[in-house]
From Swiss-Prot:
Keywords: Cell membrane, Decarboxylase, Lipid biosynthesis, Lipid metabolism, Lyase, Membrane, Phospholipid biosynthesis, Phospholipid metabolism, Pyruvate, Zymogen. HAMAP family: PS_decarb_PSD_A. GO terms for cellular component: plasma membrane. It is found in: Cell membrane. The lineage of its organism: Bacteria, Bacillati, Actinomycetota, Actinomycetes, Mycobacteriales. This is Phosphatidylserine decarboxylase proenzyme. Pathway: Phospholipid metabolism; phosphatidylethanolamine biosynthesis; phosphatidylethanolamine from CDP-diacylglycerol: step 2/2. The keyword Lyase applies. The active site is at S201 (schiff-base intermediate with substrate). It catalyses: a 1,2-diacyl-sn-glycero-3-phospho-L-serine + H(+) = a 1,2-diacyl-sn-glycero-3-phosphoethanolamine + CO2. Its EC number is 4.1.1.65. Pfam families: PS_Dcarbxylase. Is synthesized initially as an inactive proenzyme. Formation of the active enzyme involves a self-maturation process in which the active site pyruvoyl group is generated from an internal serine residue via an autocatalytic post-translational modification. Two non-identical subunits are generated from the proenzyme in this reaction, and the pyruvate is formed at the N-terminus of the alpha chain, which is derived from the carboxyl end of the proenzyme. The modification Pyruvic acid (Ser) is found at S201.
Amino acid sequence: MARRPDLKTGPERLAALVRTTVPPMHPAGLPFVGASLAVALAGRKSRWLRNAGVASAAANAAFFRHPPRTPPTRPGVVVAPADGLICLIEDELPPAELELPAVPLPRISIFLSLFDAHVQRAPLAGEVVAVEHRPGLFGSAELAAASADNERNSVVIRSPEGAEVIAVQIAGLLARRIVCNVKSGDKVGLGDTYGLIRYGSRLDTYLPAGSDVLVEVGQRAVAGETVLAELP
């Protein structure tokens, strides 16, 4: 005779429901959510302050959400390093600070709005062979000039087969803080979280020459899942 499932009740059931329906939050968001809740607590006698603090905490929790993702299993693919809208696909020189050969490479740019999840994920499985930060401006990340002018952080990942993919975090008008949690020598899996940009930004992905680009401008990308290209 089949047994009935052991359904949790009360607080345990509520906690389980929250875990399955609410995405986890990136640790970088904890100070912002905590500060907002502190404002709500300190101003609990003021309806305006209390509501503003709770609303700010909810907005920050949503912004710093870190939803689980399932990377593709087929070999030889590059996945989107960020959620957002594919705004540019063109051939461009890689960032000069990486001191790579001055040869144009296919570049796919993804714009992250304020409402996208802002964690970045490894577009390729392999070893991090270079990480370079370059100060710059904080212009609109939607503009083509943002790749050259804005503050950026470049990460080069080399696959076991020798293919190299460059993921460039680019700050925007509201994004004034780039977080990168990897360094040269680190190993990353396809779709592993490696960084975050706060409040609106852009991700450029440089592919090896000869890669087969599988996306188009105007398409939405899902970090760690959307296949941008197949390696040559």
